[in-house]
């Protein structure tokens, strides 16, 4: 929902065990709204910790249309208005009565994916979010805000060409009875009222589920929990998982390789990053429940490198 992805160079630092990043992530120029140069981590005091950060703010519609065209160029059929009603073994039933069969079925439909609902009973933490697109000039620094304005989650301002993507995500159990709408309205109003679009959704924040494969069924992306909880990164992480899944499926069909190789290769490439991110989010969720004045003290030049380790999924260090 935030439309932000790290540059390829940032991805190589964030996910050092992922091979051929440049081959995987080939975002076309027309789908890039802005290139960012900094990330500001902002406590309640408003005094940010500033870090160099190369990011790409996407035109999400253009980006997703490009992905569709790329898939079609490789032989995929793209169906619109095709709602999945049921998945049973090798059969997929649509709401309009059509039925498809396949030796392998991949669920890539987000955290409410119908394949996951049918065959997986593992629950995940989902953070409700609300965001807007707003016209204006907001600089070129990405902002992540922490504290009582977004209990258990964070708020963001991601600048775009001629505007920004601004939003809030919270954990309801820490909201003390206040609604997401109240938190979002209060935060968004800080930046003005030139709203051109408003949206809402939820973000899976438990990290990856225990298994991605059941018989001939695979999950990828948000459906498999492929979001880094400590920073919300999901687009590029899902593309990493999607490539591994695709390569495994080809190997399975051609050489009868076990589909569970998908899970093993994911752990080789992303296991340590995801573990660190889960731990950082768990610790961070506790820290962010502290009073704002303590958070303000915690965000200082001395702690600056350690805060960055939390966000970038490295093993967190804690100083007492």
Kindly give the residue locations of the regions a language model identified:
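Short beta-strand to alpha-helix junction loop
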Residues: 49-70, 114, 172-179, 208
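Helix-loop-beta segment of a Rossmann-like dinucleotide-binding subdomain
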Residues: 42-59, 91, 160-172
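A conserved beta-strand/loop element that lines the FAD pocket in flavoprotein oxidoreductases
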Residues: 72-84
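Short hydrophobic core segments
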Residues: 84, 92, 99-111, 217
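FAD/FMN-dependent oxidoreductases across multiple families
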Residues: 174-249, 254
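C-terminal helical "tail/cap" subdomain of flavin- and related membrane-associated enzymes
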Residues: 247-320
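N-terminal FAD cofactor-binding segment of flavoenzymes
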Residues: 1-39
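Conserved FAD-binding catalytic core of PHBH/FMO-like flavoproteins
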Residues: 110-180, 185, 209
């Amino acid at each position: 929902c935030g439309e932000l992805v790290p540059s390829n160079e940032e991805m190589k630092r964030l996910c050092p065990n992922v091979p051929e990043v440049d081959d995987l992530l080939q975002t076309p120029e027309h789908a890039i709204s802005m290139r960012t140069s900094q990330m500001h981590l902002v406590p309640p005091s408003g005094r940010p910790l500033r870090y160099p950060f190369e990011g790409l703010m996407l035109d999400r519609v253009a980006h997703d249309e490009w992905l569709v065209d790329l898939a079609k160029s490789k032989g995929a059929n793209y169906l619109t208005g095709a709602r999945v009603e049921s998945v049973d073994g090798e059969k997929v039933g649509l709401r309009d009565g059509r039925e498809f069969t396949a030796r392998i079925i991949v669920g890539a439909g987000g955290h409410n994916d119908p394949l996951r609902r049918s065959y997986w009973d593992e629950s995940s933490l989902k953070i409700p979010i609300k965001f807007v697109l707003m016209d204006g000039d907001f600089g070129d620094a990405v902002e992540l805000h922490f504290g009582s304005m977004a209990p258990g989650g964070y708020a963001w301002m991601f600048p775009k060409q001629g505007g920004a993507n601004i939003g809030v995500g919270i954990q309801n159990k820490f909201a003390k009875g206040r609604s997401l709408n109240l938190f979002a309205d209060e935060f968004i109003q800080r930046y003005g009222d030139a709203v051109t679009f408003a949206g809402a959704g939820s973000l899976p924040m438990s990290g990856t589920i225990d298994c991605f494969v059941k018989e001939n069924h695979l999950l990828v992306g948000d459906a498999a929990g492929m979001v880094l909880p400590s920073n919300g990164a999901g687009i590029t992480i899902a593309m990493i998982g999607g490539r591994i899944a695709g390569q495994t499926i080809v190997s399975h069909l051609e050489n009868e390789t076990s589909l569970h190789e998908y899970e093993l290769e994911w752990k080789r490439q992303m296991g340590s990053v995801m573990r660190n991110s889960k731990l950082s989010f768990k610790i961070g969720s506790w820290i962010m429940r502290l009073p704002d004045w303590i958070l303000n003290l915690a965000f200082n030049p001395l702690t600056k490198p350690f805060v960055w380790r939390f966000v970038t999924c490295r093993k967190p260090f804690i100083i007492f």
